[in-house]
Amino acid sequence: MLTVALPKGRIAEQTLEIFAEIFGGEFKFEGRELIMEKEGFKFLNVRNQDVPTYVEHGAADIGVVGLDVITEKELDIIQLLDMQLGKCKVAIGIKNEDELDWNRPNIKVATKMVNIAKNYFAQKAVGVEVVKLYGSIELAPLVGLADAIVDIVETGNTMRENGLKVAEDIMDSSAHLIANKNSFYGKKEEILSLYEKIKAVVESRG
């Protein structure tokens, strides 16, 4: 039996639709259900940020999670497939009236994605102070906590509604199928068989 970690919400629903397309029947978590067993799979309904942790530590054989989370956590897992779900960007946001001037001293950047932000600015040889927040990132520039933010952008509406604009894109992100290294070698046939089936569905959707 393969254990599959899925992030709560839309990505889980869309992934389960792919399983339904492959195996038939209905794949759905009922109410507050955290574990579902069906067709020889055990599905775990976990927080988005926790999916790669479950996979890396072997509590799940495979999982589905955004590339931004994989990049931020820098974990030792195998990336198998871009599932083309939950497409978004990681971007820098600033106030509408501001312009980026990275030569200024003492620039503060607020974000949940500390590693992504630090690595990006290090590559640009820009010295910034990264302020870690856990939510409502858009608030930081409005109250003077930070000069800019690094955050997930899907439509850009949240930034616009808060008087911010996208200044630079850092990376594209979408949901990826990942695997635990030991599971991949120990259950290679099962995982690759499932991978091929999921890949066929993803490609058929264009």
Curated annotation (Swiss-Prot):
Keyword terms: Amino-acid biosynthesis, ATP-binding, Cytoplasm, Glycosyltransferase, Histidine biosynthesis, Nucleotide-binding, Transferase
Source organism, top-level taxon: Bacteria
Keyword Magnesium in record: no
InterPro entries from the UniProt entry: ATP_PRibTrfase_cat, ATP_PRibTrfase_CS, ATP_PRibTrfase_HisG, ATP_PRibTrfase_HisG_short
Stored Gene3D superfamilies: Periplasmic binding protein-like II
BP GO annotations: L-histidine biosynthetic process
Regions that span the bilayer: none
Presence of the UniProt keyword Protein biosynthesis in the record: no
Catalytically driven reaction(s): 1-(5-phospho-beta-D-ribosyl)-ATP + diphosphate = 5-phospho-alpha-D-ribose 1-diphosphate + ATP
Pathway: Amino-acid biosynthesis; L-histidine biosynthesis; L-histidine from 5-phospho-alpha-D-ribose 1-diphosphate: step 1/9
Enzyme Commission number: 2.4.2.17
Protein family membership: Belongs to the ATP phosphoribosyltransferase family. Short subfamily.
PANTHER family recorded: ATP PHOSPHORIBOSYLTRANSFERASE, ATP PHOSPHORIBOSYLTRANSFERASE ATP-PRTASE
Domain comment as written in the entry: Lacks the C-terminal regulatory region which is replaced by HisZ.
Stated name of the protein: ATP phosphoribosyltransferase
Designated gene of the protein: hisG
